[in-house]
Structure formats: structure tokens, C-alpha cells
Amino acid sequence: MNNVLTTEIAGRELKVEFGKVGMLSNAATFTSYGDTVILTNVNASEQPREGIDFFPLSVEYEERLYAVGKIPGGFIKREGRPSEKAILNGRAVDRTLRPLFPKGYRNDVQVVTTVVSVEKDNLPEILAINAASLALCLSSIPYTIPAAAVQVGIIDGKFVTNPDTQGREKSILHLTVCATKERVMMIEAGGQEIPEDTMIDAIKYGFDECQKIIAFQEEAVAKFGKKKDEPVLYAVDPELEKDVKEFASDMIKEAMYIMEKDERNAAVDAVYEKVNEAFGEKYADKMGDIKEVLYTMQKKVVRHMLLKDKRRPDGRAFDQIRPLGCEIGILPRTHGTGLFTRGLTQVMTVATLGSISEIQILDGIDEAQSKRYMHHYNFPGYSVGEVKPLRGPGRREIGHGALAERALEPLIPSEEEFPYTIRLVSEVLSSNGSTSQASVCGSTLALLDAGVPIKRPAAGIAMGLITSEDLSEEAVLTDIQGIEDFFGDMDFKVAGTTEGITSIQVDTKLQGFSFNVVENAIRDARKARLTIIDKINECISTPKEDVSLYAPKTQIMSINPDKIRDVIGAGGKVINKIIQDTGVKIDIKEDGTVFVSSTDHNGVNEAIKIIEGLTKEVKAGEVYLGKVTKITTFGAFVEILPSKEGLVHISKLAKERVNKVEDVVSIGDEILVKVTEIDNQGRINLSRKDALVEQENKEEK
């Protein structure tokens, strides 16, 4: 039986079809917004997974190129690994839904959202969050709290819900708000230096817009939702919990109140060893329970420390930043480097400048076709003092890299202002909280060191939240470190400049957070951000005047678009010869803009000279110094400009009569010629005789 329900959101139809497809899934839906369609399937294992201390939720965001009428490139002609955008979209779905499952639920749950049709005006990533929540609510899986998502833009000073393609191009804000009926769940934002008050209002606007979609989900559940399964929730053995708490409570408290990180960790490890020695035999098959109890005890101590004692694990005030350090130019051959240190968190960011041809080509369902500015983030095991295999970037690394990239994107100069491709790589050297925001600061330093004329310096800070069990008490923390992140309830990352916010990413372990938290976090983040920017300015306040000696030099020139074919030549013959002869890289745009790049300045000048010659218009009546390229019985062909030849008839070779062309010129001779005519077929007629006469007349004068 196909159950259908529709509503209208921002002037477009939101529709769900349940029961039509995926009959063997716990729940399968077609959810559409306009002509964008998401196929969602949700399933759960029948029994909890044994021996784990986490909720095994798997969220997959699958892109199908047929959704936009494309055939995948390459030899195989099918979709391969997920794109970075798909990974980020999957993370957004996961971060919204995960806290809403029952605490202690250990059954494997898989949510698969497959993009099967895309209308450019309606973003599939927004629909995927709504579709996933809706499918879970309709299923028998014990997920009962609907969550909704909208995108908020600012166009001509007004908030707009789910702007279309044209609207997104105009909008100065790209904000995703995910919420339940009562609280905000997740925030993602990128903006052009948005003032704090405006951002807060935009989040409130987005929350209100989410309520319409939540009401739609509730209506769907009431009409055709499945009966929910009774969850089997993980619970610690009460006797074990009592024994461990009585034995270790005082020791845990004493250890957690140690301010120095390494000393505190060593003390906690010692407590764990003592507990294992004391109860290892009695609870040999319940070591996971012991670990869970100790974790809960640590968390309780940290919460009491913050909410009751009003002190942080390292003794800082709630709004205090750890000691800061900034350095530039620490690597001799790179194009730009920035070393940013905040407490025990340290990131080195390296900037590399390349030619315009080195942009990243994107092959996916996204609107963007290429990227000129990119940021990559690496988080090796040594950054936390651990031994880990070095593999490719995971979801976390991709997410952190994209977040720092978004923070700087509005500040990057245009292609016309700075004709380079820009790649930043942030290497996390030491991690004790908020390395993604340290990457923003390191990126600013590296860009300024590389001579990139960004609008102004940017910085990022991570805010945290600690709440009481009943949520009656809460404390917002500035610049959270590892222990506060681990035992805390929220990670609220804000980046921007002195003028406003350029990026936000917020997720929580709770079932949402209040607007009071949103306001306090955003306002406190500004104070911290300005402090960090002051420190950056002490190190380097403006971009270096010149790019590195080891960076390519790029010059821009404009040519008539009709002349592009002359520069490229048949099969690329002409442009390839220029590249081969001068050692440059050449990029030509459809509007006739030409970018010439090389580390050899002389090569750039030579290439520009050749291109100018190729595109210069031959004019009748002008005199040129040309080279004889071919001799026939009736005259000589002379190249007056690159790839432009004309004929000097034998009668026009000299003032006197010429019997044989070879008597006057030979191949390779350079001679003065005058353009006498360009016929309607573009053929150029030349005269050496007229050029000689004109030259003699000038000499007589």
C-alpha cells in the first residue's frame, strides 16, 4: 500500500511516499522536494551488539550521477568512492540524528539516503536530513523525536527559506539549521562576515521554519507510522557499579582535580589499574561495565567542578583562552607557512600557489564544477601521542578540512585580483582540543606569509557546554580543551574576522540546546576571536608584498576572443610550442583572459610577447619586419607576425625589375614589407618595394 502525504514549504511541495518501495526494509520512503528525490532505507539489527561502549549507527549518503543526467567518467563508468561533499552531507545527517536515539541503545542501525533525482533549486543535502528523520519516525526502530532541517539565506537584507539556485548565488549567508520541536540540534553556516546579532536572528528564523516540517513528520507518523519496538538498553550491573564507586570515588575526584594534563592522565590511568586489580577476577566478564562506570564518574566530577566549583580542569576562567603562539616562514622552500599554537594544540599550515590550470575539477551532482581554493587537514596519531597506521583521510579529517576551508573562503581574493590556485594543508602536530579552529588561524598566517591579499585576518574558536543532569544548570566555556570536549555536551565552533562570522559548525551530545546557549556562545566567541586576531596581527598584519621566490609568477593579459583559436592552433599545435619553448603554463578563458605562469620570469615575458604577436591585428598600410619562409617563381611568402604570412609578388620585391626571386631574397632573410591589401578571404598582400620607398622618404626628411 502506497501512503502519500504532502505539504508546502517555502512555496514548494514536500512529499513523502511510504510503502511503495523497499518492502523488506524496516522503513523505506521516497521523499521529494520539488523534483529533488531522496530514497531512504532504515534498518536495525534484532539484538544489541555485544562488547561495545557506543551506539553503532551508520549513516550513508549515496550520490547517483543519473540523478543529474550524467554518466560517470573514467574507464569503469560507475560511481566510485563518495565525493567529499557526499561525506560531509552524511556527517550532517549523522550529527543531527545520533543524539535523538535512546541512551544505551546498542543495536546496529543503518540509515541509507540515496539521491535519485536532483533539481538544482532544491538541495538534496537538506532534504536528506528531513528524509532520514521521517523514515526513522515511520519505522519500528525506537527513534521517536522528529528532527527537521532548513537552509536560511540572506538576500537583500531579508531571510529566505531554502533559497533556489539564483537565490543562493545572491545570498551572503548559507546557514543550515536542524532542530526538534523544542531545541536546536545542529548548525552549519558559511557567510560573508555576518554580524553576530544577524546570525542569531537567522538561527531563530531557521528554528521556526523547521517547526512546519516537524508537524508534517508528526502527521505522517500518526497516519501510517509503524508501532515502535521496545528497545533493549545497555545497563551496568548495579552491584558492580556500587562496588566500583565505593572503591574509586575519592581517587577519581583527586585525579581529575589535577591541573596538568599529563599528570592528570597518569593519575587516572593509575586509578583504572587499581580498579582492575581489585575487581578483575570478580567481574572478569564485565570489564566494559567497569570502564563505563569509571567514565561516568569522571564525567560527574568534571561537571561538578565546572557547575559547582566554577573552575575549569586547568584552572582557567570560563571565558579565558589558553596561551597563544604565532610564527610564519618556518619552512625555507614552501610558498607560505603558519605555525599556530594554543595551549597544547598546535597546527602547522602550509600554503602552495599554483597556476589557474591546477584547480580541482569536481565530478558530482553538486552545482560547483571546480575549486580554486582548497584546504586539506591531516590528523596523524602522533598528534595525540599514539601509535596509529597512516592511512588516507577519514570522515573526520574531511569534515575538519572543509570547515576551515569555509572559514577563509569569503576572504580569498578573486581570480582577477590574484591569479593563482591556492592549496592549504594543515598538519596537526599536537591536539588538545579544537584543531579545526587552530587550522583556521594557521591558514590565515600561511596565506599572509604567501602574499595572498585576503580581505582581513580570520580566526576560529571552539566553545563548549556543560549541563547538569536535569538541564537546569548550564555553563558555556571558551576555548575548550580535550577533557572538556570529551566530557562536555556541545562543540560550538565559530570562525570569522573583526567584521563578522564566516563559518559555524555546531553539534551536541544532548537532545538539543537552548537559544540562550546559542547567544552566549556566539557573543563569547567574538571576544575570543578578536583576542586571537590581535595575536595574529602582532606576527603579521598584512600580506607580504611579493609571493615566494619559489612560487610561480603569473601575469594576466586579455585578447580578442576571436583570436583564441590563433593562440591554440590546430590540435593545440601553437600553444604547445609556446609552452615547450618558454617553459610556462598557459590558461585561456572563453572571454579572452589569458593567464601565463612560470617560476621563470623571463619565460613569462617571452610567452606574452609571442601571444601578443599571434593576436595582433594586421593592418593595411603598416610596415612590418618579416621573415621569408617560402620562395616560389611568382614571389616570396613572408611571416610578418607569428602564424601570419603574406605574399610579396615578384613585381613588388624591388624598385627595379626582378627576373628571379632568389636574386633578391633567400629563405630566412628578414625584410621590411608594407601591407598593401587584405582581401575578402583574409589573404595578405605585401610589397617590399613600397616599404623601401617609404623608408627612403623618411630618411630624406
UniProtKB/Swiss-Prot annotation:
<keyword id="KW-0963">Cytoplasm</keyword>
<dbReference type="InterPro" id="IPR020568">
    <property type="entry name" value="Ribosomal_Su5_D2-typ_SF"/>
</dbReference>
<dbReference type="InterPro" id="IPR004088">
    <property type="entry name" value="KH_dom_type_1"/>
</dbReference>
<keyword id="KW-0808">Transferase</keyword>
<feature type="binding site">
    <location>
        <position position="491"/>
    </location>
    <ligand>
        <name>Mg(2+)</name>
    </ligand>
</feature>
<dbReference type="Pfam" id="PF03726">
    <property type="entry name" value="PNPase"/>
</dbReference>
<dbReference type="InterPro" id="IPR036612">
    <property type="entry name" value="KH_dom_type_1_sf"/>
</dbReference>
<feature type="binding site">
    <location>
        <position position="485"/>
    </location>
    <ligand>
        <name>Mg(2+)</name>
    </ligand>
</feature>
<dbReference type="InterPro" id="IPR027408">
    <property type="entry name" value="PNPase/RNase_PH_dom_sf"/>
</dbReference>
<feature type="domain" description="KH">
    <location>
        <begin position="552"/>
        <end position="611"/>
    </location>
</feature>
<keyword id="KW-0548">Nucleotidyltransferase</keyword>
<dbReference type="Pfam" id="PF00575">
    <property type="entry name" value="S1"/>
</dbReference>
<dbReference type="InterPro" id="IPR003029">
    <property type="entry name" value="S1_domain"/>
</dbReference>
<keyword id="KW-0694">RNA-binding</keyword>
<comment type="similarity">
    <text>Belongs to the polyribonucleotide nucleotidyltransferase family.</text>
</comment>
<dbReference type="GO" id="GO:0000175">
    <property type="term" value="F:3'-5'-RNA exonuclease activity"/>
</dbReference>
<dbReference type="InterPro" id="IPR012162">
    <property type="entry name" value="PNPase"/>
</dbReference>
<dbReference type="GO" id="GO:0006402">
    <property type="term" value="P:mRNA catabolic process"/>
</dbReference>
<dbReference type="InterPro" id="IPR015847">
    <property type="entry name" value="ExoRNase_PH_dom2"/>
</dbReference>
<dbReference type="InterPro" id="IPR036345">
    <property type="entry name" value="ExoRNase_PH_dom2_sf"/>
</dbReference>
<dbReference type="GO" id="GO:0006396">
    <property type="term" value="P:RNA processing"/>
</dbReference>
<feature type="domain" description="S1 motif">
    <location>
        <begin position="621"/>
        <end position="689"/>
    </location>
</feature>
<dbReference type="InterPro" id="IPR001247">
    <property type="entry name" value="ExoRNase_PH_dom1"/>
</dbReference>
<dbReference type="InterPro" id="IPR012340">
    <property type="entry name" value="NA-bd_OB-fold"/>
</dbReference>
<dbReference type="GO" id="GO:0004654">
    <property type="term" value="F:polyribonucleotide nucleotidyltransferase activity"/>
</dbReference>
<dbReference type="InterPro" id="IPR004087">
    <property type="entry name" value="KH_dom"/>
</dbReference>
<dbReference type="Pfam" id="PF03725">
    <property type="entry name" value="RNase_PH_C"/>
</dbReference>
<keyword id="KW-0460">Magnesium</keyword>
<protein>
    <recommendedName>
        <fullName>Polyribonucleotide nucleotidyltransferase</fullName>
        <ecNumber>2.7.7.8</ecNumber>
    </recommendedName>
</protein>
<dbReference type="GO" id="GO:0000287">
    <property type="term" value="F:magnesium ion binding"/>
</dbReference>
<dbReference type="Pfam" id="PF01138">
    <property type="entry name" value="RNase_PH"/>
</dbReference>
<dbReference type="GO" id="GO:0003723">
    <property type="term" value="F:RNA binding"/>
</dbReference>
<dbReference type="InterPro" id="IPR036456">
    <property type="entry name" value="PNPase_PH_RNA-bd_sf"/>
</dbReference>
<comment type="function">
    <text>Involved in mRNA degradation. Catalyzes the phosphorolysis of single-stranded polyribonucleotides processively in the 3'- to 5'-direction.</text>
</comment>
<keyword id="KW-0479">Metal-binding</keyword>
<dbReference type="InterPro" id="IPR015848">
    <property type="entry name" value="PNPase_PH_RNA-bd_bac/org-type"/>
</dbReference>
<dbReference type="GO" id="GO:0005829">
    <property type="term" value="C:cytosol"/>
</dbReference>
<dbReference type="Pfam" id="PF00013">
    <property type="entry name" value="KH_1"/>
</dbReference>
